[in-house]
A protein has these predicted regions:
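NAD(P)+-binding Rossmann beta1-loop-alpha1 motif at the extreme N-terminus of oxidoreductases
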Residues: 1-67, 90, 161, 195
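Rossmann-fold dinucleotide-binding core
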Residues: 8, 78, 97-174
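Hydrophobic beta-strand scaffold residues
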Residues: 31, 51, 116-118, 159, ...
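Rossmann-fold NAD(P) dinucleotide-binding segment
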Residues: 55-116
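Glycine- and other small-residue-rich loops at beta-strand/loop junctions that grip anionic moieties
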Residues: 67-68, 95-96, 137, 162-163, ...
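Helical "substrate-binding/catalytic lid" subdomain
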Residues: 168-287
């Protein structure tokens, strides 16, 4: 590592990954990125990132690697690539929302080639990421290598020491249950209000007045006012992708529930996500 600022590798440039990578670039961090989507790669390079042709190239460059990919098997695949060229002791921060047991398995996988993996799960959305105001749920924070620990404050204003590795993932899943429950509750509330022909803006103002409206839910609310005929094309595909992630997270959360009835509630919430986001249809539901 040169000087105080580590060289960072970032793998996974979806909505959150792109925002976090952009934040690092804004702070002057030297960054190399990799994603399978050439468009997101081009956007990051346009902001000043170096492009990598593989995850192995990322590992050869970086003092720290961040991973922000959709699921556990994607994380595992990235780790295989990193292991081809990583130096022993390379810190790997997993921002993906995966099962705590999968996180522990990934830590062992990285350890085979000398990687030091921690869960650093993120909450707050892309807007907070761009502003450096994410909440982080960190597993094994006390054991974070210095190069990795130095990064946390670049994109976070609230860091939670969740417990040992895997605890950050568990806390993020618990966090997401409330997030998606609020989305679902607001969708139901809007349907009731619209059916009764009352002003939904007034309803939202009342929520704000009593402090009942979280920032993530407020960011979601405009989706509820979009006419169905406008939920088409790329926008519909984007919402479906969001729903896929929500359902994945809620299935994992349901698996962690120790009380059967509560697990059933989370499963019902998971199944409701397409309707909540306004993209339910018979063909997609059958897939």
């Amino acid at each position: 590592m040169n000087g105080d600022a580590p060289k960072v590798g970032y793998v996974g440039l979806g909505q959150m990954g792109s925002a976090m990578a952009g934040r690092l670039l804004e702070t002057g961090v030297e960054l190399i990125v990799f994603d399978l989507d050439p468009e997101t790669m081009a956007e990051a390079v346009g902001l000043g990132a170096e492009p990598a042709g593989s995850t192995a190239e990322v590992a050869a460059f970086a003092d720290v690697v961040s991973i922000c990919v959709p699921d556990a098997h994607h994380v595992s695949s990235v780790l295989d690539g990193l292991g081809e060229s990583a130096v022993v002791g390379l810190p790997v921060l997993v921002h993906s929302t995966i099962h705590p047991e999968a996180m522990a398995a990934c830590r062992m996988q990285a350890a085979i080639w000398g990687g030091v993996l921690h869960d650093v799960c993120v909450a707050g959305g892309a807007v907070a990421a761009s502003a450096g105001e994410l909440a982080l749920f960190v597993g094994g924070r006390a054991d974070l290598p210095p190069a990795a620990a130095a990064l946390l404050s670049y994109y976070s204003s609230h860091i939670v020491e969740a417990g040992p590795v895997g605890s950050g993932a568990a806390m993020k899943l618990a966090f997401n249950v409330l997030t998606y429950a609020q989305f679902a509750a607001s969708a139901v509330a809007f349907e009731i209000a619209e059916g009764a022909e009352v002003d939904t803006d007034a309803l939202v103002d009342a929520w704000r007045h009593v402090g009942q409206l979280g920032s993530l839910t407020e960011q979601f609310l405009p989706v509820l006012s979009i006419p169905a005929e406008h939920v088409v094309g790329d926008f519909r595909d984007s919402l479906r992708s969001t729903v896929d992630i929500a359902r994945k997270d809620l299935r994992l959360a349901a698996d962690l529930c120790v009380v059967g009835g509560l697990g059933d509630m989370v499963e019902a919430l998971e199944k409701a996500m397409p309707e909540v986001f306004g993209v339910a249809d018979e063909i997609w539901e059958a897939l």
